[in-house]
Amino acid sequence: MKTKMIAVAALAAVAAQAEFKIDRTAMSEEYWKIWNDDVQKKIDADIEKYRKADGVFALDGVPDGAEVQVEQETHAFFFGAHIFNYGQLGKKEWNDRYKELYGTLFNSATVAFYWRTLEPYPYAPRFAERYEDTENFWNSCPQPKEQPHWRRPAVDPVIDFLRGRGCRIHGHPLVWGNSSWQRPTWIWDSFCPESEKRALEERTGVRIPSANWRLPVGVRDFELGGEWNAAWNKVYKMLSEEEIAALVPTYIKAYNYFLEKRIRDIGERYGSRVDSWDVVNESATDYHRWQDEKAVRGTPCQKSVYGLMPGDYTYKGFQWAAKYMPKTAWLNLNDYNMAPYFFKQAKDLEANGCRVDVVGSQMHLFNPAESVNIALGKGPEHLRPEGIAARFELLSNAGKPIHLSEITITAPDMSPKGQMIQAIIMRNCYRAWFSVEKMNGITWWNVVDDCGAPGEPSISGLFTRDMRPKTAYFAMDDLINGEWKTKTVAKAAGGKVSFRGFRGRYRLTWKDKDGKEQTKLAAVK
């Protein structure tokens, strides 16, 4: 308890010290011409229209004209971040400060369910915490990035922590073809008979690579992903899906079996405790390139950019998720590919009986040079006001709420100006995204510098590696806990109070006719 109080006090003190103020000189005149006053007024108007609502509440014993203190406690909108570094930062002080963000800055968290590291061996998922998942292990670990479960904490303690903090929980992902991060190597290595592997090689001259079992689980052959994809691409040119399936039927049967089993096991353990799922991640390219833009083709296997996948794997993923998850859990289709065929895929899945509740969109600004270009007014179209509007107008055609599920905005460098550039880009983009009618949540990706995946920028966090807040943290906190939180005084009339505020839970406080303070919790919806 004492440590928690220290962490809370530390964050509060930091926030008090550095109230965010925009330094417009960090950006060029060209940038501010793009994000001009008219643009900002339009964003403000849309936020007022789409993110706020009117509330009218009856108050027992309130005198006419009495002042009612109106204070928002929680948001209905989801402001999230992944929590992949839970307990892994190397010092208790850093871990405590990291944990304190969930339930204060973030009311939602994305929890890692990546198959490869969640189930490094068949029938042995890493749900429960073991010693290797504890802070003691990570605090004494000299090279954390070399550990196979870096950024992949055991699920049970993370779920318990988030529920205790009152956070919404989002699971990511159930189905994904990615051969470096998701597909367990043991499905091919252990459940495809050698006779089938030889038959495929004899027919095509292509040897599908296996994992190097001399290396530790999770570390072994990270480059295998590229080799795996390249080998299957050669096979695709020679054989149809039906011909491939005839050569490796046991593998395809095993993949289908273990994929359904995975979703069933996760649903049985976490279905009632997780609010939403990225059921299928990044499958739009396959839908367009290999499926002829048909959600259901009936083929036994699926040629995929990720290597061979089960036939109709996106459709099956949603069918299994609907079967094993409660109806209260949202089922999301998530992708970085915002081509028109992405929202077409969502509609096609629905037309074939799948429940798709939310569409997820990613936006990663990984290159520090791009942040410099944006500051100069030369940035990519999709991060300009008109580009943001066009992108989400298109995605809104799916007719679903939108979860901006993975956001990266890197600083160009760690100078004060570089940090301010990151903060201003983030602030303007968040405001524009928050103003989109169908947006229901925004999830920042890497909270801490130098804690991302290989290839991701080391300075894209809101905090430094030793958990010192960056300018972008103050800018985000200023939006979520300042500009976008309603705190006002309203006058009672006729035993009621009315006001307009951001959707969420409120505490209403007033004095009755005897001068006694009264409170009521109310929700603006």
Task: Give the ranges of each region predicted by the language model.
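Distinct, well-ordered alpha-helical segments
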Residues: V68, L89-N95, R183, H288-D292, ...
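Short Pro-Gly-centered beta-turn/loop motif in secreted/extracellular proteins
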Residues: K91-L105, S498-R507
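Aromatic-lined carbohydrate-recognition surfaces of secreted/lumenal glycan-active proteins
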Residues: G80, D275-E282, L308, Y313-F343, ...
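Conserved, mostly hydrophobic/aromatic
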Residues: F57, A109, L162, I266, ...
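Substrate-binding cleft/loops of secretory-pathway carbohydrate-active enzymes
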Residues: N332-Q362, I421, G452
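Aromatic-lined substrate-binding rim segments of carbohydrate-active enzymes
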Residues: Y102-F106, V111-E241, A246, F258, ...
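Aromatic-rich peripheral "rim/lid" segments of glycoside hydrolase catalytic domains that contact
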Residues: R24-A26, Y31-K33, W188-E223, E227, ...
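Beta-strand-rich domain onsets/edges
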Residues: E19-Q88, S108, Y121, F127-A128, ...
